[in-house]
Swiss-Prot record:
Superkingdom field: Viruses
Organism per entry: Arctic squirrel hepatitis virus
Propeptide, chain numbering: 190-217
Keywords for the protein's UniProt record, in alphabetical order: Disulfide bond, Host nucleus, Host-virus interaction, Repeat, Secreted, Signal, Viral immunoevasion
Chain positions covered by the region annotation Disordered: 181-217
GO cellular component, one term: host cell
InterPro entries with a match to the protein in the record: Hepatitis_B_virus_capsid_N, Hepatitis_core, Viral_capsid_core_dom_sf_HBV
Any one Gene Ontology molecular-function term assigned to this protein's record: structural molecule activity
Name of this chain's protein: External core antigen
Subunit text: Homodimerizes.
GO annotation terms (biological process): microtubule-dependent intracellular transport of viral material towards nucleus; symbiont entry into host cell; viral penetration into host nucleus
Protein modification: Phosphorylated.
């Protein structure tokens, strides 16, 4: 596992981001560093969510590529969430290369199975949590994700007899949502507004109808 940690550091050291440094150094030396604190969240809140809540890595990577490919591959600094997603993708790419190298050089099928299972259950889970958090912040808004995590944590810590039947659902879009379509410019949703009802046309009664000069003759 030391080789895995070194690959993480080597993969992220070339990228001048504090977020990546916190993440990699914390994993390497087991430092008490929470990469979610600067976003108003914490590892504890994310750990309240069940393990099967987070989608598979392939699904998360496909989502990140489909929605934010231009931002992730460009040289501009879009937001801290984009930077964190970049580093998570780089770390996972190096991890998959390491697993492929180990699978090719280890003859024991049992050892390979144990190593792959351990990586998926530990570091793979951390990458899944990281990608889900930052993708959700970009999609729903950071404040909405914070409220969801707090609500879910409160529900989990509430005794079962007093717990509401349904868990919170992260499904509310913010007022301003940036939607990017492939091959086109960004489309910004305007704030939600109520559609005004059409004005009623006043019916003119016979008394109010203007009379023609011929009718007065």
């Amino acid at each position: 596992m030391y080789l895995f940690h070194l690959c993480l550091v080597f993969a992220c050291v070339s990228c001048p981001t504090v977020q990546a440094s916190k993440l990699c150094l914390g994993w390497l030396w087991d430092m008490d560093i929470d990469p979610y604190k600067e976003f108003g969240s914490s590892y504890q809140l994310l750990n309240f969510l069940p393990l099967d809540f987070f989608p598979e890595l392939n699904a998360l990577v496909d989502t990140a590529t489909a929605l934010y490919e231009e931002e992730l591959t460009g040289r501009e600094h879009c937001s801290p969430h984009h930077t964190a997603i970049r580093q998570a993708l780089v770390c996972w790419e190096e991890l998959t290369r390491l697993i492929a190298w180990m699978s090719a050089n280890i003859n024991s099928e049992e050892v390979r199975r144990v190593i792959v299972a351990h990586v998926n259950d530990t570091w793979g889970l951390k990458v899944r949590q990281n990608l889900w958090f930052h993708l959700s912040c970009l999609t729903f808004g950071q404040h909405t994700v914070q409220e969801f995590l707090v609500s879910f944590g409160v529900r989990i810590r509430t005794p079962a007899p007093y717990r509401p039947p349904n868990a919170p659902i992260l499904s509310t879009l913010p007022e301003h949502t940036v939607i990017r379509r492939r091959g086109s410019a960004r489309v910004v949703r305007s704030p939600r507004r109520r559609t005004p009802s059409p004005r009623r046309r006043r019916s003119q009664s016979p008394r109010r109808r203007p009379q023609s000069p011929a009718s007065n003759c």
